[in-house]
Amino acid sequence: MKNLLDYTLSELEAILSPKFRAKQIYEWIYKKNAENFDEMLNLPKDMRTNLAQEFYFDPLYCVKFEESSDGSIKYLFALKDGNTIESVLLPMKEVEVDEGGNISRHARYTICVSSQVGCKMGCLFCLTAKGGLKRNLSPGEIVGQILWIKKTNHIPYERRVNVVYMGMGEPLDNLANVAKAIQILKEPDGLAISPRRQTVSTSGLGAQIKKLGEMDLGVLLAISLHAVTNELRSKLMPVNKAYNIEAVMDAVRGFPIDMRKRVMFEYLVIRGMNDSVKDAKTLVKLLHGIKAKVNLIYFNPHEGSEYGRPELADMLEFQEYLRAHGVTCTIRQSKGLDISAACGQLKQRSQNLSPSNNNTSKPSDIKKSES
């Protein structure tokens, strides 16, 4: 059987007759949260039967989750082949001011999705890398994470959702499928998530950054930098031996970005390694001429990690130096400190799970992880 979520609307129109049925199916899946083909009552019964024999649109289900006191939720999903991946829901508040000056606050959601089962980049601070790469996710398996999280958290269709390709795996190592997922997600008759609300995060595959730019998808770009010298970055991130800092910066300078947007540089701050004012000075020089925003991230220690969480004073001093020298800089609000927040943690803690391939779980059936 084939995963219906792997298909763009135009692809579905090409294989269905009459083709307007494709839009109806898209609306049932992405707007009306249908659980099966039998619910699609405006389709002929024989068509529903045939579709059910050829397609499925439930490529994953949740076998465990952890909910933090700050509202963030981390999910462990099982795929049809028994492999598992992680996704995270980050709820936040968005403040809006209307023409009359009235202030309102609305829920805003960011969903962090995986693009691969495992990862081959080998970053020393990442748990996922320790297991290596098993396989790429299909477009539908990527889309399925967002669909499942939106559905089970009752996020209204019209509510703004941001998507970040920052979970397990290197998105640009699975560029074709990630690009197709971006196209499926932006479909107006589907989830209608604008590319401007989708961010692709990469460890710095220079050639693939160029290819992504040439696709002109309109997405935002985030670079996992984490160090300002090639010596340290090569130690932390072996990919730097193939694409060093200078090569990454060259690729970024050629990436098409909306005039109102900036390239995000993720900088994981590790105590005593990359948290000094000297590092901040070097970073300012590296970013010269780039419309950049730096996001400082507290290292989130995992069991067996040799690295430590930085001090708040050091984070603030680093941030202040960047701001004083014209670089937009934020400190990412730590989420999920009381759960398995680091990439790969929940999966590691759940190695003994034996999920069924039958996607029958409902929100009430999900096993909440005991911290």
Curated annotation (Swiss-Prot):
Coiled-coil region list: none
Residues that, per the record, bind [4Fe-4S] cluster: C119, C123, C126
Protein name: Dual-specificity RNA methyltransferase RlmN
UniProt function note: Specifically methylates position 2 of adenine 2503 in 23S rRNA and position 2 of adenine 37 in tRNAs. m2A2503 modification seems to play a crucial role in the proofreading step occurring at the peptidyl transferase center and thus would serve to optimize ribosomal fidelity.
Disulfide bonding pattern of the chain: C112-C343
Enzyme Commission code(s) on record: 2.1.1.192
Pfam families: Radical_SAM, RlmN_N
Binding site for S-adenosyl-L-methionine: G169, E170, S201, S224, L225, H226, N300
InterPro entries: Aldolase_TIM (IPR013785), Methyltransferase_A (IPR040072), RlmN_N (IPR048641), RNA_MTrfase_RlmN (IPR027492), rRNA_lsu_MTrfase_RlmN/Cfr (IPR004383), rSAM (IPR007197)
Family per similarity comment: Belongs to the radical SAM superfamily. RlmN family.
UniProt entry keywords in alphabetical sequence: 4Fe-4S, Cytoplasm, Disulfide bond, Iron, Iron-sulfur, Metal-binding, Methyltransferase, rRNA processing, S-adenosyl-L-methionine, Transferase, tRNA processing
Taxonomic path: Bacteria, Pseudomonadati, Campylobacterota, Epsilonproteobacteria, Campylobacterales
Needed co-factor(s): [4Fe-4S] cluster
Domain Radical SAM core as annotated: residue spans: 105-338
Gene giving rise to this polypeptide: rlmN
